[in-house]
Amino acid sequence: MAKTADMRFDVVEGEDRTLNVTVSGELDITNIDALASAVAPALERKPARLVIEVGDLRFADSSAIALWVRWATAVPDIELRHVPPLLRRVVASMGLTETLKVSS
């Protein structure tokens, strides 16, 4: 698991072409590039599905949501899992629940 000052993340490519990204802590403009850089090589291999586990994410700013939307243009099936209530409301208010397939 990689770590910055306030964020930890893990990137795992599954044999079924599913890319699993787990993010915890605080994801914002100060550390978004570390996550984007770590995931980029796996996205180049064209995964069929991307699952982003955010159950332990305490904070995400608009740069996080922008990154996830950018990933959604590259991967046909993307899901945010274990989305905290506040983040769920933000994603819904932006009209992105279909694009990001938010799940509990």
Give a label for each model feature:
Residues 2-37, 56:
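STAS-typified acidic loop motif
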Residues 26-100:
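Amphipathic alpha-helical interaction surfaces in cytosolic regulatory modules
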Residues 104:
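Short loop/edge segments at beta-strand edges and connector loops
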